[in-house]
Amino acid sequence: MGCVQCKDKEAAKLTDDRDTSLSQSGVGYRYGVDPTPQHYPAFSGTGTAVAAIPNYNNFHGAAVSQGMTVFGGISTSTHQGTLRTRGGTGVTLFVALYDYEARTEDDLSFRKGEKFQIINSTEGDWWDARSLTTGGTGYIPSNYVAPVDSIQAEDWYFGKLGRKDAERQLLSTGNPRGTFLIRESETTKGAFSLSIRDWDDVKGDHVKHYKIRKLDSGGYYITTRAQFETLQQLVQHYTERAAGLCCRLVVPCHKGMPRLTDLSVKTKDVWEIPRESLQLIKRLGNGQFGEVWMGTWNGNTKVAIKTLKPGTMSPESFLEEAQIMKKLRHDKLVQLYAVVSEEPIYIVTEYMGKGSLLDFLKDGEGRALKLPNLVDMAAQVAGGMAYIERMNYIHRDLRSANILVGDSLVCKIADFGLARLIEDNEYTARQGAKFPIKWTAPEAALYGKFTIKSDVWSFGILLTELVTKGRVPYPGMNNREVLEQVERGYRMQCPQDCPSSLHELMVQCWKKDAEERPTFEYLQAFLEDYFTATEPQYQPGDNL
């Protein structure tokens, strides 16, 4: 099995894994446990830029050069660096982790398990490859493959996956007790975390996390009494017996298909596409400035298409802004794929099957959601906005209508940055029905001063939409009354069945002084640990 006894337990003594953030998440926690503030990121401090994107917030952090890769940032390729030969001869072989259907004549279709020789890996997210099964050559998405016999090729290995996202995936409907995954440790370089779905009478379904440490000799262990040469051997050992874990490992967590950041290798750099390459199939929504459709690109790739009414915005300004939007890449932001920049403007993005969060809460599955799910959705939005905050960008129109929902209650932010470009007179005057007064911070509504802190105000309003299942903010008040009353210090009361601790967070978002409002980094940390802040992050095994 690869398990060896520790020769010097003192030399590899287990350290205390407990810290202030939590790992054991589930439906059994009571509402309203507040995290201890000192354990969270700076409440209202500003972030530092991490990519060369124009600074809309007057931050002074130095931008990192465009070639630098940051976690969750510009580059999304799983495998980086030069492909090396083994033993000086041959090439490293890669294996497909998923099925893929070619989208263009340049792509290569393949099936899970197929092996490849990589011809050229200089195109970033798309590699030129030769299939050893069919002999065919073409471009393949690099995040669909991994080196043969590597841990990246294992079904249970999820790489850079955060604790909260691991819990989200493991707690998805249909996963039995013992469903597991291994991911990179967020806190310890070179270490890993084992996350397991568990169940008991008190907590119901929940997730436990165990730290996998690395020996100086290269082996791995959870407890010093059971050490392994490889992660594969560790998994095999705990598949056969619990050996101090909450339960034995039963089945790897299902991996969803990875998101592609481009439609194809050609649209990676040339992403203005012909209108005739798009087919509008089903209208999903109709707004003041256009429509949203489910459609296809090239007849084979499902996408969402936002069509804008002529005159809504300048094509030149839109294209300039889209250049920036295309560089924003985060798993909680709807990915921009391509545009048709001649009027009527088309914006092509990834498709989210459950529609807008507003409709989902009012008329869809969201009506039955309980507070833990709602807080988790808020945490996802805060996570996407924390990325926008780090990139020194601004949304300007953050509300539930501009959040999209996918499978497993995944939430992604849409329409970031577009509000700045709208040329409608009634909208630009920040008056009348077209402008979202009830979501807008007073300094932005009255004086046009939009910053990331005005987005924080809007996020506080979005929180009320979540806990009230899509109720319009400030019920019974019109826009003029809202402006007047908010300027006089009025703030919405705590909604029915909303914990006072969550309402207090809303009130912090609505501070009159914008600089006193929390950062999105803080909001994300607070909400992710809302029910779990008093628990240890990692579980010790029984008698370990």
From Swiss-Prot:
Inhibited by phosphorylation of Tyr-538 by leukocyte common antigen and activated by dephosphorylation of this site. It catalyses: L-tyrosyl-[protein] + ATP = O-phospho-L-tyrosyl-[protein] + ADP + H(+). The modification Phosphotyrosine is found at Y427, Y538. The active site is at D397 (proton acceptor). It comes from the Eukaryota. The keyword Lipoprotein applies. Pfam families: PK_Tyr_Ser-Thr (PF07714), SH2 (PF00017), SH3_1 (PF00018). It is an enzyme of class 2 (transferase). It is found in: Cytoplasm. Residues 156-253 form the SH2 domain. Its EC number is 2.7.10.2. Disulfide bonds: none annotated. One of its GO terms (cellular component) is plasma membrane. One of its GO terms (biological process) is convergent extension involved in gastrulation. Its cofactor is Mn(2+). ATP binds at L284, G285, N286, G287, Q288, F289, G290, E291, V292, K306. Transmembrane segments: none annotated. SMART domains: SH2, SH3, TyrKc. Residues 278-531 form the Protein kinase domain. Belongs to the protein kinase superfamily. Tyr protein kinase family. SRC subfamily. Tyrosine-protein kinase implicated in the control of cell growth. Plays a role in the regulation of intracellular calcium levels. Required in brain development and mature brain function with important roles in the regulation of axon growth, axon guidance, and neurite extension. Role in CNTN1-mediated signaling. This is Tyrosine-protein kinase fynb. It comes from Danio rerio. The gene is fynb.
